[in-house]
Amino acid sequence: IWHPYTSTLTPLTCYPVTNADGVYLELEGGNRIIDGMSSWWSTIHGYNHPVLNEAAHSQIDKVSHVMFGGITHQPAIDLCKKLLKLAPDNLEHVFLADSGSVAVEVSLKMALQFWHAKGQPRSKFLTLRDGYHGDTFAAMSVTDPDNSMHSLYKGFLPEHIFADSPKTGFWDEWNPSDIDSFREKLSA
């Protein structure tokens, strides 16, 4: 297997997982580690969650997967209805994507299509330095080209506008000057 973020010539060590429960991954040999990445942010409720397991078992016996190209299914409809109840009233549509990278990719395409439909085609995005948006081509283009694992692709990706990222810590009081760079780039 050619795993992500490693070379085929000098591959990084991969640790075989034999079980997963809650936040823990059990490795071959019995060691347990905390999955701080939540399997690339896809298991935010933990592994082996009884409600999610039951839903998956129930669904797999009916329909494992269908594409949304002209067809749909009730679980997707039900999920979208629940999401819309949580959303502000002016948000009336839900687009389901199969990964964060694809969600970013589709969002960028939607923004481009929006301006094209208004007769004002645009091709640049304003984004923050030190951000990460995924591994698909367009998602990499709005990820910091200098300070990220995608710096190898600088010069090959479309160039966008990068503002300094805010420096206020997560628990600190917000400092409005943190987004001065963003304001300057936006008004340029």
Identify the meaning behind each predicted range:
Residues 1-93:
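N-terminal glycine-rich, Lys/His-bearing helix-loop that initiates the first secondary-structure elements
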Residues 81-188:
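PLP-dependent aspartate aminotransferase-fold enzymes
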